[in-house]
Amino acid sequence: MRPLNVQIRLGNLRHNYRILKEMHGGKLLAVVKADAYGHGAVRCAFALADLADGFAVATIDEGIRLRESGITHPIVLLEGVFEASEYEAVEQYSLWPAVGNQWQLEALLIRHWKKTVKVWLKMDSGMHRTGFFPHDYASAYAALKQSEYVDSIVKFSHFSCADEPESGMTEIQMEAFDLGTEGLEGEESLANSAAILNVPEARRDWGRAGLALYGISPFGGGDDRLKPVMRLSTRIFGERVLQPHSPIGYGATFYTSKSTRVGLIACGYADGYPRRAPSNSPVAVDGKLTRVIGRVSMDMMTIELDASQEGLGHEVELWGDTVNINTVAEAAGTIPYELMCNIKRAKFTYIE
């Protein structure tokens, strides 16, 4: 069997939730959209079932999957519905929909609901994706408030640069949000992972923990308070010694400078490892750091082995405990979200 493995450490997930909940105060949503960032939404949700105040997903299907698996917690639909008919499933599965534009608002208001619904009303405080502009927000709020079908309203927005503390954008967005919601009663939600960790003023009634929930710092590098949940590993299935000036891999992008011992490992871009990861991207053999050399192939890649490192059959960590996923992402010119969400053809093992 091909030895590409993903370990999901559910104990680390629970640890991270507790840390983030303590930092934020109030209530905390565990964001499990995109199959919990590649970790497995149902397994992660059940691991957090006795801790989490609620969960957040992106699509109706993600919410339904949690409900049908037995999750009874509040589930926020962060993008709302994509067509008016989806409000039927919102009601059937007791989801809390976000409303971030005029047609979503109107479709909700004209529908005859059999039971009341809790709405998350989104403001565009400066990111300019979805949400009502600050000057339109009060009127959208008032329309919902007047509806007999709306149980309560959570006012929320999303930060564009909370992971860039020196940008000043988070302060600008908080000011816009506070001005646009002035005098409007109800709960609020502003803090994503970066704001939970670094912006106390953004910690309102509800936090939304995404990346940090999975043990990854949104600021790059590591964070000693968090424990990585995902560990991706494989094994060396071939090794050889190459002479000086030997090219390696497609495109001959790397030449050995001396006699070099190399290992072939079972992971490539078809498995989700980024093809654009350059030579020198870190991996670890039995806990000792080394590097990728040559171009990443579809099903395999080459790593350098020194004289002290074990070879054939030994484990190689691609990211997890020794290799920080942020380092891999930075080398490949991408972000850890993309790496985790792209994993395929691997065996998943869940460790309590």
UniProtKB/Swiss-Prot annotation:
The modification N6-(pyridoxal phosphate)lysine is found at K33. One of its GO terms (cellular component) is cytosol. Keywords: Isomerase, Pyridoxal phosphate. It catalyses: L-alanine = D-alanine. PROSITE patterns: ALANINE_RACEMASE. Pathway: Amino-acid biosynthesis; D-alanine biosynthesis; D-alanine from L-alanine: step 1/1. The active site is at K33 (proton acceptor), Y250 (proton acceptor). Its cofactor is pyridoxal 5'-phosphate. SUPFAM superfamilies: Alanine racemase C-terminal domain-like, PLP-binding barrel. Substrate binds at R129, M298. One of its GO terms (molecular function) is alanine racemase activity. Its EC number is 5.1.1.1. GO terms for biological process: D-alanine biosynthetic process. It comes from the Bacteria. Belongs to the alanine racemase family. Catalyzes the interconversion of L-alanine and D-alanine. May also act on other amino acids. This is Alanine racemase. It comes from Neisseria meningitidis serogroup B (strain ATCC BAA-335 / MC58). The gene is alr.
